[in-house]
């Protein structure tokens, strides 16, 4: 997002969370799965991890993702900088939440 100058769950090329997660290999051999995502950025003091987490917890949909009992795994990414503000001191955060039920692997 920072490099391409956008801030959204879907990138300029139309790739969304499911596309990105499929590309990571997380869903290989998976029977069922569920995903969620929170994104945020801040400039200056509001860019600290504490400030971002407080903002997410104060937002009903973001808080729901964080506390959702169905999610069992999380991936967290932090990149220096803010989308569309190349000279600003800040950070951009993504948390991807997931749960999956894997296919059993046949033993030889």
Predicted regions mapped to residue ranges:
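Secreted/periplasmic proteins that engage bacterial cell-wall peptidoglycan
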Residues: 1-24
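A well-ordered secondary-structure block
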Residues: 16-102
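Composition-driven, intrinsically disordered low-complexity tracts enriched in small residues
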Residues: 106-108
């Amino acid at each position: 997002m920072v490099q391409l100058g956008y801030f959204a769950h879907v990138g300029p090329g139309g790739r969304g969370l499911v596309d990105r997660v499929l590309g990571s290999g997380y869903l290989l051999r998976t029977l069922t799965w569920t995903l969620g995502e929170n994104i945020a950025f801040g400039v200056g003091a509001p860019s600290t991890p504490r400030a971002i987490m407080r903002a997410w917890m104060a937002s009903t949909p973001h808080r729901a993702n964080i506390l959702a009992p169905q999610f069992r795994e999380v991936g967290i990414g932090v990149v220096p900088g803010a989308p569309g503000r190349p000279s600003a001191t800040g950070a951009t955060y993504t948390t991807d939440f997931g749960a999956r039920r894997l296919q059993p692997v046949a033993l030889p």
